[in-house]
UniProtKB/Swiss-Prot annotation:
<keyword id="KW-0805">Transcription regulation</keyword>
<dbReference type="GO" id="GO:0045944">
    <property type="term" value="P:positive regulation of transcription by RNA polymerase II"/>
</dbReference>
<dbReference type="GO" id="GO:0003690">
    <property type="term" value="F:double-stranded DNA binding"/>
</dbReference>
<dbReference type="GO" id="GO:0001228">
    <property type="term" value="F:DNA-binding transcription activator activity, RNA polymerase II-specific"/>
</dbReference>
<dbReference type="GO" id="GO:0006357">
    <property type="term" value="P:regulation of transcription by RNA polymerase II"/>
</dbReference>
<keyword id="KW-0010">Activator</keyword>
<keyword id="KW-0804">Transcription</keyword>
<dbReference type="GO" id="GO:0005634">
    <property type="term" value="C:nucleus"/>
</dbReference>
<dbReference type="GO" id="GO:1990243">
    <property type="term" value="C:atf1-pcr1 complex"/>
</dbReference>
<feature type="region of interest" description="Basic motif">
    <location>
        <begin position="12"/>
        <end position="51"/>
    </location>
</feature>
<dbReference type="GO" id="GO:0072686">
    <property type="term" value="C:mitotic spindle"/>
</dbReference>
<keyword id="KW-0469">Meiosis</keyword>
<feature type="region of interest" description="Leucine-zipper">
    <location>
        <begin position="52"/>
        <end position="66"/>
    </location>
</feature>
<dbReference type="InterPro" id="IPR004827">
    <property type="entry name" value="bZIP"/>
</dbReference>
<feature type="domain" description="bZIP">
    <location>
        <begin position="10"/>
        <end position="73"/>
    </location>
</feature>
<protein>
    <recommendedName>
        <fullName>Transcription factor pcr1</fullName>
    </recommendedName>
</protein>
<keyword id="KW-0539">Nucleus</keyword>
């Protein structure tokens, strides 16, 4: 090889190495930016998760409080008001459920009726305000040969099992 050809090859090699250094530098910079954006996204998702868990806890406490109030009014004579509240509650639940399903199209399980999860009493224990409802809207107890005691009813009403699926329960 001649000195001139070697000089040309060295110059060509130097340019290639310089381009590689520039490309590697750009890649490292983009990688740093990508990692920073990914960390920000992860932090935002974590913060949103914490907020949603707090909201879920608050909603579960509110459901507990409302169920306690319903149990406290089982024997009272405020039938019109209770029926109105239950109807409003069912309407609001159906509206929220339909909005939720617009974002997540999944078939609801059969019998997804909030009245069943809010009030669980047998027809003999039914509040007078509910006795006028059509049979398909009567809250039903699970079939059993004996009536549950009030502790069993309260445990069901206040456990996650008595909550709608959207609040962490199976219903």
């Amino acid at each position: 090889m001649t000195a001139k050809k070697k000089e040309v090859d060295d110059e060509k090699r130097r340019r290639i190495l310089e381009r590689n250094r520039i490309a590697a530098s750009k890649f490292r910079q983009k990688k740093k930016e990508w990692i920073k954006e990914l960390e920000q996204t992860a932090n935002a998702a974590f913060e949103q998760s914490k907020r949603l868990q707090l909201l879920l806890s608050q909603l579960q406490q509110e459901a507990f409080r409302l169920k306690s109030q319903l149990l406290a009014h089982q024997g009272c004579q405020c039938s019109v008001k209770i029926r109105s509240v239950l109807t409003d509650f069912q309407t609001a639940h159906n509206a929220l459920h339909s909005q939720h399903m617009a974002y997540r199209p999944v078939q609801p399980p059969p019998g997804d009726n909030m009245l069943e999860s809010v009030v669980s009493v047998s027809p003999t224990q039914m509040h007078p305000s509910l006795q006028g409802l059509p049979p398909n809207q009567h809250p039903q107890m699970p079939p059993s040969s004996q009536q549950p005691n009030s502790d069993d009813v309260q445990q069901h009403m206040f456990s996650a099992a008595g909550l709608p699926r959207s609040l962490g329960g199976p219903i």
